[in-house]
């Protein structure tokens, strides 16, 4: 069902914390040289989108900057296996540094997902309640 062990492990944390979520349940169209579609890994009941990454390659980083510029209403956050991993073999910038630079929230999967990310306050977001669609 899940495309990676990291996504599976993230789902286990969400289930353990009794957080309602949908897996790959939304299509966001965006333009990047040509029209593309993004399917988030997890959409939490509170509307937060979790994107789980073992590797965070250049194309993924570009994609998320394009998506955010075209869909600023969505709160996309990263769950990394290792946020301290370097973007490039001999580089200094880490995944965490990149997120800080571009103001994306992130966490380390092994440390669990921050509790404030999981809170719903009894409300379901519009993004969570709608059916999977191709509309952005």
Where are these regions (language model features)?
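Nucleic-acid endo/exonuclease domains
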Residues: 1-136
């Amino acid at each position: 069902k899940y495309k990676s062990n990291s996504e599976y492990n993230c789902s286990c944390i969400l289930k353990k914390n009794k957080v309602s979520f949908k897996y790959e349940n939304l299509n966001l169209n965006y333009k990047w040289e040509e029209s593309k579609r993004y399917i988030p890994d997890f959409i939490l009941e509170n509307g937060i989108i979790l994107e789980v990454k073992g590797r965070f390659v250049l194309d993924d980083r570009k994609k998320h900057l394009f998506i955010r510029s075209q869909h600023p209403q969505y709160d996309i956050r990263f769950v990394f296996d290792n946020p301290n991993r370097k973007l490039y073999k001999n580089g200094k910038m880490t995944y965490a540094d990149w997120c800080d630079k571009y103001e994306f929230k992130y966490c380390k999967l092994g440390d669990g997902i921050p509790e404030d990310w999981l809170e719903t306050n009894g409300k379901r977001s519009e993004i969570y309640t709608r059916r999977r669609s191709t509309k952005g």
